Amino acid sequence: MNPLEKIHMQLMWNRLISVVEEQAQTLIRTSFSTTVREAGDLSAGIFDPEGRMLAQAVTGTPGHVNSMAESVSHFLEKHPLESMKEGDCFLTNDPWLATGHLHDFTTVTPAFHQGRAVGLFSSTSHVVDVGGRGFGPDARQVFEEGLNIPILPLIKKGEVNHDLLEIVRANVREPVQVQGDLFSLAACNDEGCRRLTEMMEEFNLNDLKTLA
């Protein structure tokens, strides 16, 4: 790699970091929970088609980032990238597949460029209310902590899964807040996808392999 190519690569890397940071800032600006808006209890990042993390937002908590990086592979096991469509967004708060306890929700959204899936955006945030015994550490079993959602589509081809949201709303004390938090996770992934498309067009990239 010659000096000019190194400079070009560094420019693309800095731009990719700004993409995921804007993803995280979108989550903060649109979240309903104060744990996200004020405490920054979140993570955001971009992954290659194999589910390997390429970049993470500076904003967020290390615990979320590490568990989110591992959880994307579980999403791909259930929903391979080749089966995902533009406009999809998948969701879970399974503590064994995602971030450790039911209050942390993780979403995964495929990123498309020129009609092909080129990567994935994922985000995690702490949702204050998931039902169960309520706030605090009183639960002795995971079933007492609240609603456990397996990896399911929150949005499919741009259409919201209202059946899933109806189940969530029926099991929490703050349905409007929780639904807003789930939509904020989807929104920040969408912003990441949009910014990635702009970046790939600007640098004339067909995929993320070279940058990865």
What are these regions (language model features)?
Residues 1-31, 50-54, 58-60, 64, ...:
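Extended, highly charged
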Residues 2-11, 148-212:
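N-terminal leader/propeptide and maturation segments of large enzyme subunits in energy/redox metabolism
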Residues 15-39, 76-80, 91-98:
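Short, basic/aromatic recognition patches
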Residues 33, 42-92, 200-212:
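Gly/Pro-rich turn-and-neighbor structural signature
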Residues 38-41, 103-105:
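Short, small/polar residue-rich loop motifs at catalytic or cofactor-binding pockets
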Residues 98-104, 130-131:
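Short, Lys/Arg- and Gly-enriched loop/turn segments at beta-strand edges
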Residues 104-114, 122:
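A short, hydrophobic, proline-anchored segment that marks a local hinge/packing element in signaling
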Residues 117-171:
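Gly/Pro-rich active-site capping loops and adjacent beta-alpha segments
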